[in-house]
Curated annotation (Swiss-Prot):
Belongs to the ATPase B chain family. F-type ATPases have 2 components, F(1) - the catalytic core - and F(0) - the membrane proton channel. F(1) has five subunits: alpha(3), beta(3), gamma(1), delta(1), epsilon(1). F(0) has three main subunits: a(1), b(2) and c(10-14). The alpha and beta chains form an alternating ring which encloses part of the gamma chain. F(1) is attached to F(0) by a central stalk formed by the gamma and epsilon chains, while a peripheral stalk is formed by the delta and b chains. The chain crosses the membrane at residues 19-39. It is found in: Cell membrane. Pfam families: ATP-synt_B. This is ATP synthase subunit b. The lineage of its organism: Bacteria, Bacillati, Actinomycetota, Actinomycetes, Micrococcales. InterPro entries: ATP_synth_B-like_membr_sf, ATP_synth_b/b'su_bac/chlpt, ATP_synth_F0_bsu_bac, ATP_synthase_B_chain. It is a single-pass membrane protein.
Length: 188
């Protein structure tokens, strides 16, 4: 028997599940081509522009980073050179300070030695002057005492200046001679 289903099947082939109809393929191809043209014409240039912008930004960033790195390296080298120069200068200053300190110490020592020699010479001169003054004073006093004693022993006045001066000089010479003999005797 012939049923409508069988009639249709006899006149046409049944549609395939895997293969669509020809009109679907044509319309799908037309839509695909239209979409491809629209994307190619409008979207793709924007994507390329965006990618080019990103590429330029990345390249610019890399270039800036390389410049910054080069500047940092140059600054580091300059600072290292300045540091080495500063250390060398500090060493020179330290050495100059040592030399100056040695020279100043020598100068102060020389000045102190000269001052000590001057003070010693001045003190010796003062001592010698005071000794001479004491000798003169003692000679005068001893002379007076000797004349008074001699006047008392002799019983006559020794007012004659020449005689009294000669007597005093002889007495003092005897006194110095006995003192010198006492020193040489005690030294041996």
């Amino acid at each position: 028997m012939l049923t409508p289903h069988n009639v249709m099947a006899a006149g046409e082939e049944a549609p395939s599940i895997l293969l669509p109809a020809v009109y679907d393929i044509v319309w799908s191809a037309v839509v695909f081509v239209v979409l491809l043209v629209v994307i190619w014409k409008y979207a793709l240039p924007r994507v390329y522009a965006m990618l080019d912008g990103r590429t330029e930004a990345i390249a610019g960033g890399i270039e800036k980073a390389e410049r910054a790195q080069a500047e940092a390296d140059a600054a580091k080298a300059e600072l290292t050179a300045q540091l080495a120069e500063a250390r060398a200068e500090a060493g020179r200053i330290r050495e100059q300070a040592r030399v100056d300190a040695t020279a100043i110490a020598a100068e102060i020592k020389e000045q102190a030695t000269a001052d000590a020699a001057r003070i010693t010479a001045s003190a010796q001169q003062q001592i010698e002057a005071e000794r001479q003054q004491a000798v003169v004073s003692l000679r005068s006093e001893v002379g007076s005492l000797a004349i008074d004693l001699a006047s008392g022993v002799i019983g006559q006045s020794l007012t004659d200046d020449q005689r009294s001066t000669a007597l005093v000089d002889r007495f003092l010479a005897d006194l110095e001679a006995s003192e010198t003999a006492g020193r040489t005797g005690s030294a041996s």
